[in-house]
């Protein structure tokens, strides 16, 4: 769905950003999935 798609975009974008932003994106992705 759109939520999962958005999380996927965050993870992909995080890889091209500085490490601090990448880590933030990972936290958002994991937190959003509730795992």
UniProtKB/Swiss-Prot annotation:
Its EC number is 3.1.1.4. The keyword Phosphoprotein does not apply. InterPro entries: PLipase_A2 (IPR001211), PLipase_A2_dom (IPR016090), PLipase_A2_dom_sf (IPR036444). Belongs to the phospholipase A2 family. Group II subfamily. D49 sub-subfamily. Transmembrane segments: none annotated. It is an enzyme of class 3 (hydrolase). Pfam families: Phospholip_A2_1 (PF00068). It catalyses: a 1,2-diacyl-sn-glycero-3-phosphocholine + H2O = a 1-acyl-sn-glycero-3-phosphocholine + a fatty acid + H(+). Dimer. The keyword Disulfide bond applies. GO terms for biological process: arachidonate secretion; lipid catabolic process; phospholipid metabolic process. Its main location: secreted. It comes from the Eukaryota. One of its GO terms (molecular function) is calcium ion binding. Binds 1 Ca(2+) ion. Its cofactor is Ca(2+). Expressed by the venom gland. This is Phospholipase A2 neuwieditoxin-1. It is found in: Secreted. Ca(2+) binds at residues 27, 29, 31.
């Amino acid at each position: 769905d759109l939520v999962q798609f958005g999380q996927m975009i965050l993870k992909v974008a995080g890889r091209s950003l500085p490490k601090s932003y990448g880590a933030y994106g990972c936290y958002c992705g994991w937190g959003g999935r509730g795992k």
